[in-house]
């Protein structure tokens, strides 16, 4: 029964969404100033999976939006005093309930990867799409998040031909020693099985 519900969620998400002018339709759009132009706008060839929660381990609040939009109040929580001046972003955030927020159009360069390299190529922000999952490295991600993530990836694969299922990686893989997300709690096999199921 669980697999049936899981598959239904996947098809529900993928049927709703399309890409129009490099933005997903039928999701929340929250524009951020934290982006710039890609050196080669058509070179979108890598998907990077991250995780984030603010404060760490707390879910379902407005603080991720505020961080990405440079509106985080350092007096709200002690943790914010060290991060509120960061200018960072991702293209997408997938929340615990599977709902999705887009901050940056896919043809623009979001500031999610930092110092990074993939297969010998540096500056992954130049050629990647960054997807944040609301979560931590020690708490399991939800079925709704996997369903939404798989649906989003399938749509991105169709829209941007340089992407492939072989070019999906974690932040930890492009910034080893510096970053550890999405962590051991992320089930790569579950994601790949869902993507492969859609191909059948």
Would you name each region that the model predicts?
Residues 17-25, 122, 127, 136-200:
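Basic/polar, cationic surfaces and motifs that engage anionic cell-wall
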Residues 131:
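Conserved, mostly hydrophobic/aromatic
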């Amino acid at each position: 029964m669980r697999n049936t519900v899981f598959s239904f969620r996947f098809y529900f998400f993928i049927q709703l969404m399309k890409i129009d002018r490099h933005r997903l339709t039928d999701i929340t759009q929250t524009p951020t100033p934290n982006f710039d132009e890609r050196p080669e706008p058509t070179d979108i060839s890598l998907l990077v999976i991250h995780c984030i929660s603010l404060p760490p381990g707390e879910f379902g609040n407005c603080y991720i939006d505020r961080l990405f939009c440079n509106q985080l109040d350092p007096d709200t929580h002690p943790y914010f005093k060290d991060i509120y001046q960061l200018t960072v972003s991702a293209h997408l955030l997938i929340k615990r309930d599977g709902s999705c927020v887009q901050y940056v159009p896919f043809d623009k360069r979001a500031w999610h990867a930092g110092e990074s390299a993939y297969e010998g190529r540096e500056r992954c922000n130049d050629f990647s799409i960054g997807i944040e999952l609301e979560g931590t490295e020690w708490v399991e991600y939800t079925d709704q998040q996997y369903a939404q993530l798989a649906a989003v990836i399938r749509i991105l694969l169709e829209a941007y031909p340089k992407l492939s299922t072989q070019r999906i990686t974690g932040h930890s893989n492009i910034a080893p020693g510096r970053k550890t997300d999405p962590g051991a709690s992320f089930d790569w096999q579950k994601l790949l099985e869902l993507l492969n199921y859609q191909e059948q």
